[in-house]
Amino acid sequence: MEEPRCLQANCFFRGKEHSIQLSVSQAVLEVEVEERRSTKRWRGHFDAASVEDLTRKTGNFKQFGIFCSMLEAALMKSSEAVSLELLTYGDLEALRCCKVGVATRVPPSTSPLSSKRYLILVYCVEFDRIHYPLPLPYIGEADMAALRRLVQEQQDELAQLRDELRRAQQEVWRLEDERLRDKAWHQQEQRRMTKELTEVKAAEKMLRAHVKTLTAELAVCRKGRSTSATAPGCPQDRRRSNSRDSRSSSQGRLPPRSPSPAGSRPPRFNPTAFVRSREQRRQEAELRRQKLPRGTVSSGDNCRRRGRRSSSAESLQSRRSAQSSGSEADTCPQRRRGLGGPSTRSPLSASSCNSTSVASHPNRGCKQHGKENLGTEPSATLSEIDARLQALQAYISTLGTHM
């Protein structure tokens, strides 16, 4: 079931204010017009058939729904194509007579037609103007008691609206105060956070400066560590130069043998010196076979065999055997000097050499001298080899004189 549509608006006709009320429900149109000052009222009911018949008589047919929409648009003044006029029966007759061209007839005041009002819906098109009249019978003035009740209701409603307005104003004032308090609090928080941000920026600046200082100090420390790491290389260079000088100056003389300092680094293996010492040992062995008697040579061979067997257990001893042979040559003159008395160098004898170097345990002596010479430089090894060669030459010359 369709709900009724109600619409009310105030309009001025001939300088007087009128209240127009429309109600549309179930294909029935109800129109009521009331004059505000005199409280006179006119009301009319129109069904869909009567409305469509009215529009057909005017020559411009409109359906009921379209006609109601046009009436609402004219009442709300939402369209310039439609408008409203309120005429009496005399005004309507005057317009008809003017259109036809005859004299106007004025109805008597006692006629019921004179009390009617006609609500005219004027529809303006481009080259035409159509009038749709709606007759509204007079229903009399409003009841005073009803008017009083209506006024009282309106006054109560007005008081209620004023009370609501007062509460709304109070709510607005409360919200305004709350907004101001929130604004003040936010401003205070903003100032505090701005101050904290300034302090944090200052602290960050100080920390950045501190980081730069620490970075510079770290760079200085690293540079100092690198220079200190490269500084010990100078004594090594000096030792190398000194070893070269001592090697050049050791030709033809036997330098005193000094024990290696404790904790020194073991010498680096020199393959050239090792090959030279091996060749020298081979030549010395050949010379000994030629000059020494058979018993002495056989004992020397046994000593060398035992030395090779002891050195074959460890590859490092073969490299140190050249150094130990030179140390044996040094020990023989020292013992000979201690037994002979004077410190002058005397030629080696076969008995003394056999008693010291051949009859003694050569492997034990080689191991001990090898341990002493672990920290010596290649220059000391070469000087010992030279001394050993000189001792062998002296020994060979001694053997030649005995034979």
Curated annotation (Swiss-Prot):
The keyword Coiled coil applies. Residues 310-328, 349-360 have a biased composition (Low complexity). CDD domains: HD_CCDC61_N (cd22284). Residues 1-142 are annotated as: Head domain. Residues 236-247, 276-289 have a biased composition (Basic and acidic residues). One of its GO terms (biological process) is mitotic spindle assembly. Keywords: Cell projection, Cilium biogenesis/degradation, Coiled coil, Cytoplasm, Cytoskeleton. InterPro entries: CCDC61_N. It comes from the Eukaryota. GO terms for cellular component: centriolar satellite; centriolar subdistal appendage; centrosome; ciliary basal body; cytoplasm; microtubule organizing center. Residues 144-178 form a coiled coil. It is found in: Cytoplasm, Cytoskeleton, Microtubule organizing center, Centrosome; Cytoplasm, Cytoskeleton, Microtubule organizing center, Centrosome, Centriolar satellite; Cytoplasm, Cytoskeleton, Cilium basal body. Residues 224-377 are annotated as: Disordered. GO terms for molecular function: identical protein binding. Belongs to the CCDC61 family. Forms homodimers (via head domain). Microtubule-binding centrosomal protein required for centriole cohesion, independently of the centrosome-associated protein/CEP250 and rootletin/CROCC linker. In interphase, required for anchoring microtubule at the mother centriole subdistal appendages and for centrosome positioning. During mitosis, may be involved in spindle assembly and chromatin alignment by regulating the organization of spindle microtubules into a symmetrical structure. Plays a non-essential role in ciliogenesis. The N-terminal 3D structure (head domain) resembles that of NHEJ1/XLF, PAXX, SASS6 and XRCC4. The coiled-coil domain is involved in microtubule-binding. PANTHER family: CENTROSOMAL PROTEIN CCDC61, YEAST SPT2-RELATED. This is Centrosomal protein CCDC61. It comes from Gallus gallus. The gene is CCDC61.
